Amino acid sequence: MTNTRKSHPLIKIINHSFIDLPTPSNISAWWNFGSLLGICLVVQILTGLFLAMHYTSDTTTAFSSVAHICRDVNYGWLIRYMHANGASMFFICLFLHVGRGMYYGSYTFFETWNIGVLLLFTVMATAFMGYVLPWGQMSFWGATVITNLLSAIPYAGTNLVEWIWGGFSVDKATLTRFFAFHFILPFIIAALAMVHLLFLHETGSNNPSGLISDSDKIPFHPYYSIKDILGLFILLLAFMTLVLFSPDLLGDPDNYTPANPLSTPPHIKPEWYFLFAYAILRSIPNKLGGVLALISSILILTMFPILHTSKQRSMMFRPLSQCLFWVLVADLFTLTWIGGQPVEHPFIIIGQLASILYFTIILLLLPLTALMENKLLKW
């Protein structure tokens, strides 16, 4: 009699994905973030579901309903802060996951990589709409500023913005539709994540050396299931420390003031995980140019497979490319810092230089360095 795990039509799929999956024997803790992202998504969907039971998407009561959740609902404060900080944890894992893909050359799996970039866009859209829902000052003005960027699109821009707003400004219609989209998008993300996994399991995982590992593979369970659980506990420790000790650390104090269309906050800025893109947007004085740079800063990830000029897949044995990669990481930290600063000297010029460096490293320096390394290795 065959094992149910291997013969049952439904359990068989789970078995091939998480139990008997042949996995390279040398993948490091950097390969943990895929499963952690899955857990983050589940946490966000569950906490979001319970928040949606008490939240009202009306401009007059949205802010009060969030206060009601925190004060009157059983453990409402915990659910709310887990959801808010869960987004931050989600993005930390996302950035590390993408960074690992860039470092170890995982982008050579075209379909997996491009669906990953699409997932990044979808998660960013979901997080942006979620930030609008508490209807605080930064929610309202963030929504106004970011949606207004679409007016830079020639000819159709103004009509498009008013269509998204559902009126002539960010108002009740905008909040209602943002809530609807914020509710549905995580399920679309879950579906995309399954497609992401489907394509990954067609080729098998990459590994730190970047070499083909078919001759040396081990089953995912128990080896990597245990390893992933360790990563999960470390993530939960950091996450719950943040939620229980300083839940407002990553938030904006302005969002504790109810939205007021007549009073503009001194510095309008998005959540920390968008600051790098926001800095790139602000570094260009022209509105349309800024919007194009903003979109390009993420879309440029789809260029990685095309720009790969090295004879080696991974950066593990390429010290010059490694140096450039870490300069790029430092540059992203700089952009994140600049995005949170006011638009004044010297922050403007630092932001412009950091933006130029970001695109130069990816489009020019990394491919040229890889070619030089090929020459140094006499390939």
From Swiss-Prot:
<keyword id="KW-0472">Membrane</keyword>
<comment type="subunit">
    <text>The cytochrome bc1 complex contains 11 subunits: 3 respiratory subunits (MT-CYB, CYC1 and UQCRFS1), 2 core proteins (UQCRC1 and UQCRC2) and 6 low-molecular weight proteins (UQCRH/QCR6, UQCRB/QCR7, UQCRQ/QCR8, UQCR10/QCR9, UQCR11/QCR10 and a cleavage product of UQCRFS1). This cytochrome bc1 complex then forms a dimer.</text>
</comment>
<keyword id="KW-0496">Mitochondrion</keyword>
<feature type="binding site" description="axial binding residue">
    <location>
        <position position="196"/>
    </location>
    <ligand>
        <name>heme b b566</name>
    </ligand>
</feature>
<feature type="binding site">
    <location>
        <position position="201"/>
    </location>
    <ligand>
        <name>a ubiquinone</name>
    </ligand>
</feature>
<feature type="binding site" description="axial binding residue">
    <location>
        <position position="97"/>
    </location>
    <ligand>
        <name>heme b b566</name>
    </ligand>
</feature>
<feature type="transmembrane region" description="Helical">
    <location>
        <begin position="226"/>
        <end position="246"/>
    </location>
</feature>
<dbReference type="Pfam" id="PF00032">
    <property type="entry name" value="Cytochrom_B_C"/>
</dbReference>
<feature type="binding site" description="axial binding residue">
    <location>
        <position position="182"/>
    </location>
    <ligand>
        <name>heme b b562</name>
    </ligand>
</feature>
<keyword id="KW-0813">Transport</keyword>
<keyword id="KW-0830">Ubiquinone</keyword>
<dbReference type="GO" id="GO:0008121">
    <property type="term" value="F:ubiquinol-cytochrome-c reductase activity"/>
</dbReference>
<feature type="transmembrane region" description="Helical">
    <location>
        <begin position="77"/>
        <end position="98"/>
    </location>
</feature>
<dbReference type="InterPro" id="IPR048259">
    <property type="entry name" value="Cytochrome_b_N_euk/bac"/>
</dbReference>
<dbReference type="GO" id="GO:0005743">
    <property type="term" value="C:mitochondrial inner membrane"/>
</dbReference>
<protein>
    <recommendedName>
        <fullName>Cytochrome b</fullName>
    </recommendedName>
</protein>
<feature type="transmembrane region" description="Helical">
    <location>
        <begin position="178"/>
        <end position="198"/>
    </location>
</feature>
<feature type="binding site" description="axial binding residue">
    <location>
        <position position="83"/>
    </location>
    <ligand>
        <name>heme b b562</name>
    </ligand>
</feature>
<comment type="function">
    <text>Component of the ubiquinol-cytochrome c reductase complex (complex III or cytochrome b-c1 complex) that is part of the mitochondrial respiratory chain. The b-c1 complex mediates electron transfer from ubiquinol to cytochrome c. Contributes to the generation of a proton gradient across the mitochondrial membrane that is then used for ATP synthesis.</text>
</comment>
<feature type="transmembrane region" description="Helical">
    <location>
        <begin position="113"/>
        <end position="133"/>
    </location>
</feature>
<comment type="similarity">
    <text>Belongs to the cytochrome b family.</text>
</comment>
<dbReference type="GO" id="GO:0045275">
    <property type="term" value="C:respiratory chain complex III"/>
</dbReference>
<keyword id="KW-0479">Metal-binding</keyword>
<dbReference type="InterPro" id="IPR027387">
    <property type="entry name" value="Cytb/b6-like_sf"/>
</dbReference>
<dbReference type="GO" id="GO:0046872">
    <property type="term" value="F:metal ion binding"/>
</dbReference>
<dbReference type="InterPro" id="IPR048260">
    <property type="entry name" value="Cytochrome_b_C_euk/bac"/>
</dbReference>
<dbReference type="GO" id="GO:0006122">
    <property type="term" value="P:mitochondrial electron transport, ubiquinol to cytochrome c"/>
</dbReference>
<dbReference type="InterPro" id="IPR016174">
    <property type="entry name" value="Di-haem_cyt_TM"/>
</dbReference>
<feature type="transmembrane region" description="Helical">
    <location>
        <begin position="33"/>
        <end position="53"/>
    </location>
</feature>
<keyword id="KW-1133">Transmembrane helix</keyword>
<dbReference type="Pfam" id="PF00033">
    <property type="entry name" value="Cytochrome_B"/>
</dbReference>
<feature type="transmembrane region" description="Helical">
    <location>
        <begin position="288"/>
        <end position="308"/>
    </location>
</feature>
<keyword id="KW-0812">Transmembrane</keyword>
<dbReference type="InterPro" id="IPR005798">
    <property type="entry name" value="Cyt_b/b6_C"/>
</dbReference>
<dbReference type="InterPro" id="IPR036150">
    <property type="entry name" value="Cyt_b/b6_C_sf"/>
</dbReference>
<feature type="transmembrane region" description="Helical">
    <location>
        <begin position="347"/>
        <end position="367"/>
    </location>
</feature>
<keyword id="KW-0249">Electron transport</keyword>
<keyword id="KW-0349">Heme</keyword>
<keyword id="KW-0679">Respiratory chain</keyword>
<dbReference type="InterPro" id="IPR030689">
    <property type="entry name" value="Cytochrome_b"/>
</dbReference>
<feature type="transmembrane region" description="Helical">
    <location>
        <begin position="320"/>
        <end position="340"/>
    </location>
</feature>
<keyword id="KW-0999">Mitochondrion inner membrane</keyword>
